[in-house]
Amino acid sequence: SKVFAYHTSVYYRDAFGIFASNGILFNHESPRRGPTFVTKKIVQALVRIKLKKQQCLTLGNLYAIRDWGHAKDYVESMWKILQYKKPDDWVIATNEEMTVKEFINKCAKKLNITLQWKFKGIKEIAIDKNSKKTIIKIDKKYFRPGEVDFLKGDYSKAKKLLKWKPKYKSDDLINDMIEYEKDLYE
């Protein structure tokens, strides 16, 4: 459906001169991200584990690589796309790559949870060094069929023509998500 929408926009732009731009937005996250998305699952679970309201988080592919940006940056890019002198197609991304496991490690560090990773593959686990409990494990049922292992965007065109670049780093995004989640329990 995304590909169809893209080509429909291009068709109407070219055929009828409609101001129709496409924004190809790589993964963009915020504290309000839905609970079925991996970043939200990770943040929510680690905050709950820290507060002793949850024991373990079960995930799929820890080695999927994503280009995660902050939704605030992406909203700004959308506005800039609409202000540009002519319609065009744009890639909005951070040009940064991070594995799911790296995202977990950053979140854990922010929450002062020291993880010890053990084993490889489907048996890989993370143990909280303080409590000695397994708090992250893997289950095949969370591996998505047809999942793309590597997603990284190049926003150089937007940088050059729109003068847009992301302001928020991954640590800022993680901090915002964690603070939002912690506030729900205070």
Describe each region flagged by the PLM.
Residues S1-S21, V43-L51:
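Active-site Tyr-X1-5-Lys
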Residues S21-I24, I92:
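Short glycine/serine/threonine-enriched helix-capping/active-site loop
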Residues F26-E29:
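Proline-glycine-enriched beta-turn/loop adjacent to the NAD(P) cofactor-binding site
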